């Protein structure tokens, strides 16, 4: 019985340790490590190889969307950020307009709304910067006022 309980505890602890997946994009200038933890998307680390510095974002949103719903009371803006979405899938991404860029696409779904979002990260072999873009879909009419990435 003690052996069974020990096995269950070990399996539980190892399951907790596997809840984060990391995705790395890298070239000679920089590396960006993106992490999905408990189905939430965030940048874990950005490494500037030329300056030999490492940035670990601690209190910034991966993105934010400010919008309103037409017909609602004026000055009724909503703001959603990465914490309001869960990651439903991840796949490698190659931008057809920039074949030299490689990266990942993260599909997200709103936790408490009917919004969906695809976040694209891409890095070309000679770029000293990483590109991030969003594709936002809503099942209701909204007025998108501001996007921060």
Model-based region annotation:
Residues 4-15:
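Sec-dependent N-terminal signal peptides
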Residues 104-149:
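Acidic, contiguous internal or C-terminal segments within carbohydrate-active enzymes
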Residues 4-5, 34, 134:
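Residue-level detector of intrinsically disordered/flexible regions characterized by low predicted structural confidence
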Residues 16-20:
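Sec/Tat signal peptide C-region and signal peptidase I cleavage site
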Residues 15, 26, 125-126:
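A general, composition-driven signal for non-globular sequence regions
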